Amino acid sequence: MINIAGVVSIVLFYLLILVVGIWAGRKKQSGNDSEEEVMLAGRSIGLFVGIFTMTATWVGGGYINGTAEAIYTSGLVWCQAPFGYALSLVFGGIFFANPMRKQGYITMLDPLQDSFGERMGGLLFLPALCGEVFWAAGILAALGATLSVIIDMDHRTSVILSSCIAIFYTLFGGLYSVAYTDVIQLFCIFIGLWMCIPFAWSNEHVGSLSDLEVDWIGHVEPKKHWLYIDYGLLLVFGGIPWQVYFQRVLSSKTAGRAQLLSYVAAAGCILMAIPPVLIGAIAKATPWNETDYKGPYPLTVDETSMILPMVLQYLTPDFVSFFGLGAVSAAVMSSADSSVLSAASMFARNVYKLIFRQKASEMEIIWVMRVAIIVVGILATIMALTIPSIYGLWSMCSDLVYVILFPQLLMVVHFKKHCNTYGSLSAYIVALAIRLSGGEAILGLAPLIKYPGYDEETKEQMFPFRTMAMLLSLVTLISVSWWTKMMFESGKLPPSYDYFRCVVNIPEDVQRVGDPSESGEQLSVMAGPLARSYGAATMAGKDERNGRINPALESDDDLPVAEARRINQETAQAQVKKMLDNATGVKPSGGGGGHLQSQSGMAMPTAEQDNTAF
């Protein structure tokens, strides 16, 4: 029977999210459809909204439904994701937020494409895309499960309907809409779930959590210790190289603020996990055959994935479930747009523009991104319909990102000079091969290699092969890069063998971004006839390759626009002059000023100086 109150609550909360999303989308500068404006909200996200949207990086439909499901099926000990993703925000803030934001990148793939080339960056886009699709699929599956409980709709129908609504909503705007709906989303989750907990806990059918038969804590068997560590490391470090995270980092006004938001959001992740943990424990203490629930008991995998909406539906009064179910549904819906936008942004910029259409206009890129939003939404829908467990889907989404992307992102951010395209491709192949060799029970992939401790009964690998794949990928990246560099630079391999043109056979028109300038907020390099800059405040002009004035790289001080522009121009001129001096091999004389000395010490008369700018 259809729950009228539940349907009304969903409609009202959806309208709230939709109105906020449309209102936030109007904050975009009129007529400004640039990549930064749509993908990064003009790098103008403030502290209050930033805290909420950074927390919502992980806190969404999959987070709350998956946490409750894990508590019910395996216990608190095995509910690693809230703690793992919280730590990933901490480590991301310490090691990645500051350098990534200082260099003014637009997507997470920018530094990878910078170091390894456009086509290798396109290859690295694939695991990033898989991760975003898996995550969005988990969100849609959670929403479909919620709707099937509330209005008694078939699960498949509800997933398809939910994805259509999410895609439609995402097309309304870029990061402005995503960020401001995140504020509503977290308020809905926090207030809606906490309102339901006292009523569910006091329900007459709920037993005592201290009962020995109600094991909501769980335990780790000795044979699963390495598996437990493997999953923990996967969540912590596999939670860093995600565009949904760096989208928030790169949209912050300053690098310092990006770090601060990461730390505060980590605490927010733990705080927001408390309500679903309690709801999962309440569900564990409930004999469901004594309630109004009419499904199979003990609960099957299909039912356990819906455990949170089931608690709200069957253990709370109608007027309470009105808020709880509606709030959860709206929260799930608003979190779907973030992953879809992230994947579409990376495709439009790092694949379509930088590989196929380097001279594409900004409006063309925006339209490509909108089409990509629809395609990514369809892929996520297919995944949501084919994988039964939300928590399994949620955990699996970090696998490829962890073993492939994390080692490569670590190297290009902190050790760029010690890696090249040969090492990147080799590491990619090694990581993918080892990960696939372990199989995947959720996808029905049989293992090619049964590592030590393999459980024949559960078809599960107890050996930490994911972490092994990540470490071997890192070692391969470093060693192959070192070997190829040594072979080419020593002359043992002729330059013509440098097929990737990344060691000695580098053409003049290849674009590379170097180290940040002394100002710490600028990044541009003259390479051949073109200058490339990722959002850096260098030479004025609308085209990105000529540099675009970027208000995000201003300090937190409210400088007048004219003053900020003057500082940017002076810094850019100083950079260009320094690079030209280095290129011509001249340096100022230390003796009397008025002469320039060549590196051989020969005096040269200076040209008459004029006052015109570059």
Swiss-Prot record:
Q: Which residues are glycosylated?
A: N289
Extract one GO BP annotation from the record: acetylcholine biosynthetic process
InterPro entries named among the record's database cross-references = Choline_transporter (IPR052244), Na/Glc_symporter_sf (IPR038377), Na/solute_symporter (IPR001734)
Question: Keywords in UniProt for this one?
Answer: Glycoprotein, Ion transport, Membrane, Neurotransmitter biosynthesis, Sodium, Sodium transport, Symport, Transmembrane, Transmembrane helix, Transport
Sequence ranges on the Extracellular membrane side = 66-75, 141-158, 207-225, 284-305, 386-394, 446-467
Localisation per UniProt entry? Membrane
Q: Look up the record and report any one GO term of the cellular component aspect.
A: plasma membrane
Residue ranges of the TM segments = 6-26, 45-65, 76-96, 120-140, 159-179, 186-206, 226-246, 263-283, 306-326, 365-385, 395-415, 425-445, 468-488
Q: Which PROSITE patterns does this entry report, sorted A to Z?
A: NA_SOLUT_SYMP_3
Region spans: Disordered: 583-614
Q: Which GO terms describe its molecular function?
A: amino acid transmembrane transporter activity; choline transmembrane transporter activity; choline:sodium symporter activity
The main location is membrane
What CDD domains does UniProt report for this protein, alphabetically? SLC5sbd_CHT
Q: What does this protein do?
A: Imports choline from the extracellular space to the neuron with high affinity. Rate-limiting step in acetylcholine synthesis. Sodium ion and chloride ion dependent.
Q: State the family it belongs to.
A: Belongs to the sodium:solute symporter (SSF) (TC 2.A.21) family.
> Which PANTHER family does UniProt cross-reference here?
HIGH-AFFINITY CHOLINE TRANSPORTER 1
Q: Can you name this protein?
A: High-affinity choline transporter 1
